[in-house]
Amino acid sequence: MNPSPLSSKNALITGASSGIGRAIALALAEHGVSTALLARRKERLEEVAEQTYKTGCRACIFVVDLSDPAETETAVSRAAEELGGIDILINAAGVALQSGLSNGEFEDWKTMMDINVLGLANVSRHALPHFPDSGGHILNLSSMSGHRVPGKGGFYAATKFAVRAMTEGLRQELRAAGSLTRVSSISPGFVDTELLDTYFANTDDRTSRYDRIGYPLLKPEEIAELVLHQLTLPATAEVTDILVRPTAQAT
């Protein structure tokens, strides 16, 4: 069996304790990637690290609140030192709250902005100096809500439109600087993760994720497969964004 083209690379993953971030961390480990796992919940991170060890790859965990700039900078620096550099950055951390623009809570808006936008930008800028001169890959988790605005999620959509803008903006900055580091994003529709529970927390609907939406959802592992596809493309190819939704999702 031929070794994976990702073998022996180092990846920093935010939001690695659950959902899509967790699935990506485990998929990368299966391909021989050493990982730095960043999230808020230590017990969850330890569980992901234990699963990673079973593949023979190493993982280090960092409990961090990405809304805290200094804490984030320290975590990224320590992760890069522990790994011996960063080849891949996966910005998978995110918060989804159904907080409207006309009647939403300011604290909800601030939480989404701090994690989805400022946290992502802060992790990226502190990780970049640790990338190899030959170039690495930054992959941001966006959303279908970064392409169209759902009726009750205007502010969340605004943060995901911002992720798309930052993805393209950073890509252009790096090209102008002569860097070959690729920058891309994935924009999923509904994925079967606890993020949906948070998104619907402000409603009276307490049914299951499936019953709430009414059709089979994407699985985190399916998003991880798309991540692997992007990361293993030839160095001369760069997919800027992938839109993926459940087959039954109309919009």
Regions found by a protein language model. Give the residues of each.
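C-terminal helical subdomain
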Residues: 181, 185-186, 205-251
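The beta1-alpha1 cofactor-binding region of Rossmann-like NAD(H)/NADP(H)-dependent oxidoreductases
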Residues: 43, 63-74, 106
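Residue(s) in the substrate-gating loop at a strand-loop-helix junction
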Residues: 143
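Substrate-binding pocket helix/loop in short-chain dehydrogenase/reductase
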Residues: 100-101, 105-111
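Conserved glycine-rich cofactor-binding loop
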Residues: 17-18
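Active-site helix of classical SDR
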Residues: 124, 159
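Conserved glycine-rich Rossmann-like NAD(P)H-binding loop of the short-chain dehydrogenase/reductase
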Residues: 31-48
